[in-house]
Curated annotation (Swiss-Prot):
Catalyzed chemical reaction(s): 4 porphobilinogen + H2O = hydroxymethylbilane + 4 NH4(+)
Free-text remark on how the cofactor is bound: Binds 1 dipyrromethane group covalently.
One GO MF term: hydroxymethylbilane synthase activity
Pathway in which the depicted protein is active: Porphyrin-containing compound metabolism; protoporphyrin-IX biosynthesis; coproporphyrinogen-III from 5-aminolevulinate: step 2/4
NCBIfam families: hemC
Role description: Tetrapolymerization of the monopyrrole PBG into the hydroxymethylbilane pre-uroporphyrinogen in several discrete steps.
Enzyme Commission code: 2.5.1.61
InterPro entries hit by this protein: HemC (IPR000860), Porphobilin_deaminase_cofac_BS (IPR022419), Porphobilin_deaminase_N (IPR022417), Porphobilinogen_deaminase_C (IPR022418), Porphobilinogen_deaminase_C_sf (IPR036803)
Descriptive protein name: Porphobilinogen deaminase
Gene Ontology cellular component annotations, sorted alphabetically: cytoplasm
Cofactor annotation: dipyrromethane
Length: 306
């Protein structure tokens, strides 16, 4: 029996349940084990309670042999590798975009100046401020249904959350606008899951690798390499999105390229630096480093710390 560790929220158990079902479909017995994390018990803003707070307890549960596998929202994982663990599977990614859930069915451009928007993410807050719409951005915690209720009960005019999360718990009908990357660039690895286990568990690594999706792995590798090179944590005002796209060479042959867009924003919205690049999926990390270095040359490090 493969024991899959997960946080107890509806979103987390839905994500982990998808991995359990995928393993069962391939003939492997699997079950969910709920692990309580410090992040779930704190009401403080994410940037105050520490990078990787939601993932640390799951990793310790693996190390203590309470569970065999942990399913993480990949964007929550620290960029620094932990040699005790390996990620054999990054399943196909959900929609990576952010989504607005606003009162009265409004889109961003229809919200009057002074409207109060809640978000858990400094990255979203910085980019929303940079749009120059005069919105008031407030920090937001709680599970997705709690965040949505802040709009329906009139506490907030809107919230911005990951579209993937709403999709996974069946709440897409609440979205009033899906935000394109040109408006708000998503977090590195947003919409992707990381399926993690002990490095030395070679048989389990082979089983989990059956669920891996090569294009998603390439994209996430580039995005997280960019984040790591900027020496920015998962709560920093940094956005990145990579996509595998088909191209045609001069002789008419189709081949895959990897495109990457990245940005760094001042938290007050006063400036956003953008850079992009194209590489190949098998050199995803190098592409991430190259785009990060372009951002650094443009002044990203000072901007992130502003």
């Amino acid at each position: 029996m493969i024991r899959i560790g997960t946080r107890g929220s509806l979103l987390a158990t839905t994500q982990a349940g998808g991995i359990r079902d995928a393993l069962r479909a391939k003939g492997h017995e699997a079950e969910l084990v709920i692990v309580t994390t410090a992040g779930d018990q704190s009401a403080a803003p994410v940037e105050q309670i520490g990078v990787g707070v939601f993932t640390a307890a799951l990793r310790e549960a693996i190390a203590d042999d309470v569970v065999d596998v942990a399913v993480h929202s990949y964007k929550d994982l620290p960029t620094a590798a932990d040699p005790r663990f390996v990620i054999p599977a990054i399943p196909p990614r959900e929609d990576y975009r952010d989504a607005l859930v606003a009162r009265d069915g409004l889109v961003l451009g229809e919200l009057p100046a002074g409207s109060v928007i809640g978000t858990s993410s400094p990255r979203r807050a910085a980019q929303l401020r940079a749009l120059g719409l005069g919105l008031e951005i407030r920090p937001l915690r709680g599970n997705l249904d709690t965040r949505l209720s802040r709009v329906s009960n009139g506490d907030l005019d809107g919230v911005v959350v990951a579209r993937a999360g709403l999709a996974r718990i069946g709440r897409l009908d609440h979205i009033t606008e899906t935000l394109e990357p040109v408006q708000v660039l998503p977090a590195p690895a947003q919409g992707a899951l990381a399926v993690e286990c002990r490095s030395e568990a070679t048989d389990l690594v082979a089983v989990l690798a059956e669920l891996d999706h090569a294009d998603t792995r390439a994209a996430v590798t580039a995005e997280r390499a960019l984040l790591a090179e900027l020496e920015a944590g998962c709560t920093a005002p940094v956005g990145a999105i990579a996509e595998v796209v088909e191209s045609i060479d001069e002789e008419g042959r189709v081949f895959d390229e990897l495109s990457l867009r990245g940005c760094a924003a001042a938290l007050d919205g006063s400036d956003v630096i953008r850079a992009s690049g194209i590489g190949t999926p098998d050199r995803a990390a190098e592409l991430g480093l190259a785009v990060a270095r372009e951002l650094l040359d443009l002044g990203a490090r000072a901007l992130i710390g502003r």
